[in-house]
């Protein structure tokens, strides 16, 4: 959670053009923490769903995550309300149900308010994306607090269009 706190506090000012060295240090440290967390705990459904999307349309990984994460968070908050409550608060939100909205507001502040459709994904791609998600991202799916099936993943892709 420290990485999220640091990113929320410092990345918007850097995106706006600040050259503040302490902010750069904080964002760099947050990135390091993120890498250690991924190495130790793995990733969850947003990454699992993003990899097929970036594979089919050569989407930049961060943009794919930006399109998918708020939608997946909205669907997942009931599976880990305390965790999502903490994330929402770190991003300036106040309620568990509002975590997806807090993520959306943060993404807007850093110019990453995107949809999969803006990245070239269409509704016709969803069956392929869904099947490939389950082929290549089983660990990410299993690691996510909300257990999902193909129908749920397809719906989440559709909502992210």
Describe the predicted segments one by one:
Residues 1-102:
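Active-site segments that bind and position negatively charged phosphate/pyrophosphate groups
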Residues 92-161:
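C-terminal charged capping/lid subdomain of soluble metabolic enzymes
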């Amino acid at each position: 959670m420290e990485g999220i706190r640091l990113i929320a506090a410092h990345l918007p000012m850097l995106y706006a053009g600040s050259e503040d060295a302490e902010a750069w240090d904080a964002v760099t440290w947050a990135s390091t923490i993120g890498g250690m967390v991924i190495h130790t705990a793995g990733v969850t459904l947003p990454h699992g769903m993003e990899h097929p999307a970036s594979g089919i349309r050569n989407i930049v990984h961060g943009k794919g995550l930006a399109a998918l994460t708020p939608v997946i968070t909205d669907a997942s908050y009931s599976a880990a309300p305390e965790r999502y409550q903490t994330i929402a608060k770190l991003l300036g939100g106040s309620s568990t149900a509002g975590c997806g909205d807090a993520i959306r507001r943060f993404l807007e502040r850093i110019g990453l308010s995107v949809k999969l459709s803006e990245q070239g994904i269409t509704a016709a791609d969803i069956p392929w994306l869904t099947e490939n998600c389950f082929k290549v991202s089983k660990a990410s799916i299993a690691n996510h607090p909300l257990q999902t099936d193909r129908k749920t993943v397809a719906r989440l892709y559709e909502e992210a269009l």
